[in-house]
Amino acid sequence: MRTAVATFGFGRPDFFERMLRSLGTCLEVSNGTVDVFHFLDGGPGSEQDALRAVIEASGVPYASIVARPENLGVGRQLIGARRELLDVEGYDRMVLIEDDIELNSTYLTSLLNLSDWAETYADVGTVQVWNVEAGSKQSLQPYLHQVELTNRHFVTYCLTKRVWDIIKPVLYTYEKKFLMRRPYTKRPHYRIRRFMRQQLKHAPKTPQNPRLDPPSQAIHNPFPSVPWRTAPTSQDAITSLAMYLAGLHRITTRVSHAYYYGETGVHCTPEVYDLMGFNDQGWWQWDAAPERFEIRYKDSNGSWLSSYYR
């Protein structure tokens, strides 16, 4: 499939450089199998010139730098990138990479292999090979081929045109109603939560066969409730909601091929980072990418795995 890789930058050139350096170790980037697009948000604090300098100095091949003339905010920036690459440019799938994730050299090979595998199932949505799984390298090595359902953060993932076409009506409605003509940080949280509650009144759809069709005990609503004061209202939350309502499952490898280092940022502090379990990440370097995959729904004790949106 024709594949685009989208990176996202706003300030923090040191973060962006660390991410970009790791992206350059992926074979698909160096041999031109994928096209890399750098989306740089604008406005005060954007440091676009510094980010451009990082990109040019890195030597990592790229197709285009998309520098926004104003500050779109995270929501419009991510929705816009998906629109431009999947709707306008016609890519079959895209990989989204934020500026605070470090990739193993096996990252893209593993992710695209998983995407190919997942495309045989009509009820799989996004796929990712970043996860939080504690354990030593020796203890995790046997499980590189295992995948599981997830509701974790959308730090980096692969989205196909097929899935985007299914979920984009909800995202475009959210964008039009709540993100235009105002800063993303001042989006109307209560109105968005009302929108989410209205959406959740609809039962999830059932995609046609063939399906992965997980047992009901393994499936968890990312938003079993929408508290008025605390429910997340980000575009990531709406993306997760849209996939749930479409009957699409998010999946991840059990063992991670990337490391999230965003301890400080727009939505994160060291305390939140620890609360989310990110300190339990292992950062192991793998020599080979899995070529076959096996879904697991239970842990080693026979208990159902669970994952909630966080």
What are these regions (language model features)?
Residues 1-97, 101-310:
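Peripheral/terminal regions associated with large enzymatic or DNA-binding modules
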